[in-house]
């Protein structure tokens, strides 16, 4: 389990730990094309829409969960108060993207990921501000936000390849979390801990 600070500066190291756990759980036992993992990210985006649509919102103080030392108590509270809420599904989107990035190359991830995401974040914010669309963006429905993520990620995949597409998804999720006022990094932290407790392939086929 990653023991460092959960912040955007450490995202490459966090992603590598996510990938190690995914490998241990059997998600990379079979060699599959990148489209498989991109499709799984799309499925998480769909789950985020459905959770938001159903009003499934996390109300527990995540610091309480983070500081819970008893694994069984943590697991029980996570499943009852966080799991399948829309913020949790948002964390899954980023976790899957980081997993795929780490599989693509840990060395490159350590060297370039944080700078690439920082540049993308600045570019996205500057574009929205320049066009006077930041406030409009904040008012978008969740389905609209997800549509724009998928549309642009597809374009980025064609123009810049898998890494560009995955980095764009993470960048958009960061902005979504900020504008909806939830702590994405803390949700990633508790989901990583929970995922380490889960069975092989999380009891699913893939």
Q: What is the meaning of each model-derived region?
A:
Residues 1-206:
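Flexible "arm" and connector segments at domain edges
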